[in-house]
């Protein structure tokens, strides 16, 4: 009888030591951050930003080979722990946090598998990494769009040659790049700060670089500071000044990271947002909101007015052809998804690099050197390309569905700010954009 009593008492003791509520999200988040930072040692593109505790950074020398099995086991364990979290008493925001963490972990595991040699189709990769399903378009769709351009562009003959000859009139001279960009940035910041109160110490350093596969990049450094780099490998057209000022700065990546740091990391203590794994659902929101933010900051004709009255003269460009230029650029926007199709076929092994570049030359009217630069981007970032156009469409539809239309700019800014301040994924935005 005595052994049975002792066994019963031991069981009671063990049960009393077990946390009835399961693992905490904070504990899972801390392990997640450490895991992401360790994986980042094996892929320099993986960690886009980190401004969390210094002691969480990996110490010592990394192993010679990727410890994929260890990383996958840890990622899977954290996912299992997420499912064991006691969510009774959770607010809607708490639920959003947990869902976001789960989707980020799925993306982390997927990326580790890819680093280890696993190959996904373009669509599967996009779904697992970015929580989105990219649409498909045929060449017939793009052919019909090109016919609209044919009637607008001056001259006769090859459409790509005519297009590039026309837009080359609107290149910012190299010696005027810095002046034009800084004026565009100042105006973008002024417009953003009217609706989103930014910290007094927020700022970024602007650098001009070469030999990159991208046109611009924001490296967020924490404490409301960023490093923004602009690639000058290829000529930069006048509309790119506002594009990059908004996308990389205000109200794009810089503001997005400032708000996440202030709202989630500093105020709520959610440390998982102090690390940004690039190949994750967070990127679709980041890139989509950065592109949509251009329209939020410079709605309708306001952008054209500012560019014609301020930036064109600063760049020394003839404003007489501006209206035709904007008409052409508006039609070109409809061809955005042609780049996704080129990437899908190329990454699925259906076409070669040269054929992908040829597709871009035909359906995005890219100059040969620009088309080849884009294939370098596909090599480096793969299905990430969907985040710019599909991301923008998802964000735009969500904001406008919630009432943030162009004729209600105050509400548009309010919804946009909320979107930048809280955990959201593509799937959650789509779900909240239907009747």
Feature names for model-found ranges:
Residues 1-23:
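Bacterial Sec-dependent N-terminal signal peptides
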Residues 17-435:
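N-terminal maturation segment of proteins
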């Amino acid at each position: 009888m005595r052994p049975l009593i002792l066994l019963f008492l031991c069981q009671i003791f063990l049960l009393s030591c077990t946390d009835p509520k399961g693992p905490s999200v904070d504990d899972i988040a801390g392990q997640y951050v450490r895991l992401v930072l360790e994986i980042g040692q094996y892929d320099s593109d993986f960690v886009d930003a980190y401004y969390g505790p210094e002691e969480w950074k990996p110490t010592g020398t990394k192993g010679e080979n990727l410890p994929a099995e260890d990383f996958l086991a840890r990622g899977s364990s954290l996912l299992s722990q997420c499912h064991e979290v006691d969510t009774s008493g959770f607010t809607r925001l708490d639920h959003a946090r947990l869902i976001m963490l789960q989707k980020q972990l799925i993306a982390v595991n997927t990326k580790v598998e890819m680093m280890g040699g696993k190959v996904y189709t373009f669509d599967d990769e996009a779904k697992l990494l970015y929580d989105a399903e990219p649409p498909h378009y045929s060449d017939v769709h793009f052919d019909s769009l090109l016919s609209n351009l044919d009637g607008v562009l001056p001259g006769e003959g090859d459409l790509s040659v005519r297009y590039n000859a026309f837009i080359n009139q609107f290149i910012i001279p190299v010696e005027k790049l810095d002046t034009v960009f800084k004026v565009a940035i100042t105006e973008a910041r002024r417009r953003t700060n009217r609706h989103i109160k930014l910290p007094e110490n927020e700022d970024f350093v602007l650098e001009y670089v070469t030999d990159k596969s991208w046109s611009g990049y924001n490296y967020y450094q924490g404490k409301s500071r960023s490093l923004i780099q602009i690639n000058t490998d290829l000529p930069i057209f006048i509309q790119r000044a506002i594009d990059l000022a908004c996308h990389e700065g205000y109200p794009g990546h810089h503001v997005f990271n400032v708000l996440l740091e202030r709202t989630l990391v500093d105020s709520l203590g959610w440390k998982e947002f102090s690390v940004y794994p690039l190949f994750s659902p967070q990127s679709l929101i980041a890139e989509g909101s950065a592109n949509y933010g251009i329209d939020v900051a410079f709605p309708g004709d306001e952008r054209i007015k500012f560019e014609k009255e301020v930036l064109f003269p600063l760049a020394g460009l003839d404003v007489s052809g501006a209206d035709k230029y904007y008409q052409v650029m508006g039609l070109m926007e409809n061809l955005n998804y042609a780049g996704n199709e080129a990437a899908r076929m190329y990454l699925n092994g259906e076409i070669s690099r040269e054929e992908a570049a040829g597709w871009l030359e035909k359906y995005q009217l890219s100059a040969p050197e620009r088309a080849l630069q884009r294939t370098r981007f596909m090599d480096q970032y793969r299905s990430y390309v969907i985040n710019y156009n599909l991301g923008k469409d998802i964000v735009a539809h969500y904001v406008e569905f919630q009432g943030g239309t162009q004729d209600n700019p105050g509400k548009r800014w309010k919804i946009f700010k909320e979107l930048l301040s809280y955990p959201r994924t593509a799937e959650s935005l789509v779900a909240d954009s239907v009747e």
